[in-house]
Amino acid sequence: MKYMIEYTIRDTGLTYDQNFANRDALLKAFSTWKPDAGLNVMAFVSDLASNGYVLVEADDPKVVASFVGKFVFWNDVRVNPVIDVMEAVPIAGAALAWARNAV
């Protein structure tokens, strides 16, 4: 299963010094991180500010929860299960056919 993880580094309401300390702690924690067994990181990108996306694949959702849990102290996170668009198109077509026949 693939998951798109959206993150925003939390800085709202922090003082100048707290913001620096928060970023410093996050960078130190991230420098020691390695993906757990069973977590395939397909893309890890930043918008060059305080937000980013991580596309991961894992058979066990607990592996994804473990990854997210490690960084939730610094980030607001949203996890969305996703499928490849080539898989989504026939599903959408079948759903449309069903909806047309349902009414």
Q: For the regions a protein language model found, what residue spans apply to each?
A:
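Conserved, structured core segments of small domains
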Residues: M1-V103
